[in-house]
Structures are given as structure tokens and as C-alpha cells.
Amino acid sequence: MTKYLELIKKEIDETELSVVSKKVIKSTINKIQKFNEEQYKNPNDLIKIIKTFLKNNENLNTSHTFIAHIKSILKHTSLKDMISEIDQNEIEKLFLKYKNLKERKDDAEEPSKKHQENYIPYEELVKKYKQVKDKLNWKDKLIYGLYVLQPPLRADYGDVKLILDSDETDYSDINENYFLLGESKMIINQYKSNKVMNKEGEFIHKPLIFMVDEDVYDLIYDSVKLGIEEFGEMRTYLIEDRFGKKMKPNTLSKNITRISMLLFGKAIGIQEIRTIYCSRFQLQDEDCSIETILEDAGKMGHSISVHIKKYMKRYVKPK
């Protein structure tokens, strides 16, 4: 790989780019040269290096600058003749992705006065809940745990059917949501943004499917066990109201706010818990991880644009 990169450096020197531009672009080439020569031997391996660098880098500005320089190298040197069209297209996609993220860097909004007053850092929400959860009744313990221990932190948990034996039960109806007890798997079919556009321009169904972590599974399992002891049979839905019906989003939201008042003396609702979670990292922070933001948006079931514009707030964090 080194001989190809040295050739590209010479070609950069021969361009009409400014002295500063030449210097910073060659600095990016130096970063590429630091990767294992035995593992990455020729230009066809460049895309692997690019993806590895972007994956491991935590800083948005650095990532954007890096991929922008690669794009500039493609434009001004023979690199475009050394790598495949597929890789060139992949580089273009990566450039557009990081360009879009950088342009949105300052889009995060200030929280409302109410949201700021109710703000508690996410890690403190989790810590406090874990400290006092055993003092809550099993239903409150379950409801709040679902919303602070693991994303997607949605208002759709009241409409989730409990499935004891997934091998013998049909759970293919996309109009229903399911939790498979035997597999620790949550399948959320019905939620606000469950339609995405495919390459043909058609909207298709996109379920949220994820494994719950051990803490959440234990909460659900214990609640099922206690529910059977209390009512003599397993309930139908993950969260039910006092009439044994699935809990409606509005009722669920009121319960979350009520439990927040018990725990923190603040009326923190579902929407605020979502924004607190999504704002763990600030776009303005130097150590903001782009991959984490992309991962968070995917888990929450909304677009990157919605994630940044609606849910990432510039909270004033307590000292």
C-alpha cells in the first residue's frame, strides 16, 4: 500500500491546490499509512481502512475531515483508477453521511424551561431506580424499569402481548406487538415510524426487534411470576391497566410521570426520559461518538434527523 500512497502524495504536490490543502491532505494519507502494511496491501483495501478509521474515531469533525480528504484525493489523483467503482460509490455515501451529520451539528435545540427544570442525567435516573426499585410494587417496578434500563424507551410497551412458548404460538401478525419469554425477544410491529421507504420508493413495514438485556428480562419474568401468584394465571399483555386490559399510551405516560414524582420529586414523563437518554452525548462535545448517535437512532426507531433535531437537547448539566 505504501508505494501507492507515496505516488498519490506526489500527484497531490503537482495539483493546483493551496499549500495548506496539500499539507492537510497529505496528513490524512499519513494516517492511512499507519495501518498494518501486511493486512492492507493494495488500494482495494482502502475502503476497509476508511471504515475502520471512522468506526474507531470518536470525533465528528475529524471523521468529516478525513472522508472529505479521501474524496478530494479521488478527485485530484489517479486513486480513482486504482479502486473499483463500487468502492468509489461507497466513499461518496460515507462523505454524504458525515457531511449531513456535520451540517446538523448545531441543530440540537435548547430544552424547554420545563424540560430543563426536570432534567436529571440519564446515569442518575438509572442509579436511583436501581437503588429503590425493590421498594416499588411489581407493576411500578416493571413500568419504570422498561423506560430507564434499555432503549427504545417507547410508549408502545402497553400494547405488547406476552408469549410463553414461541414455538407453539403464532406471533406473525404485524398488527400486534410481542414479547417472547422463551427467547428474551421483543418484537414491536406497531409504532409511530414503522414504515420506511425501500429503493423502489415503496413504503415497507419495519419492525423493531431486539433482545432485552438481563436486567429487563428479570423484571419481566418476576412480574409474570408475581402476576400469576396474584391473579392465578399469566396476563395477556406486558403492561395491563387495573381492568386487565392493555394499558393505553396516555395511561402509561401518566404512570411514568407519577413514578418519577415518587422517585425524584419531578414530573419527568416518557418524552423527557427519551430526550434525557438521547442527550447522553452532545453533538457539540469533542468526544461525541457518531456511531453511537447512529446506533441510538436505530434503537429508538426514528431517523437520524428526528433524533438530532427533536431528541438531542442542549441540557445545562449539573456541576
What are these regions (language model features)?
Residues 5-95, 271-276, 300-301:
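Non-catalytic DNA-binding core/recognition domains of DNA-processing enzymes
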Residues 202-267, 271-273, 277, 282:
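Active-site/catalytic core of tyrosine-dependent DNA strand-transfer enzymes
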Residues 143-147, 275-287:
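Short, amphipathic alpha-helical "recognition" segments used to contact nucleic acids or chromatin
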Residues 160-216:
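Conserved tyrosine-mediated DNA breakage-rejoining catalytic core shared by Y-recombinases
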Residues 122-156:
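Basic, Lys/Arg- and aromatic-enriched nucleic-acid-binding interface segment
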Residues 83-130:
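Flexible interdomain linker/hinge and immediately adjacent N-terminus
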Residues 283-287, 293, 298-319:
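Catalytic-site neighborhood detector that most strongly recognizes the C-terminal catalytic loop/helix
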Residues 45-46, 66, 153-160, 287-298:
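Short, charged amphipathic recognition helices of the HTH superfamily
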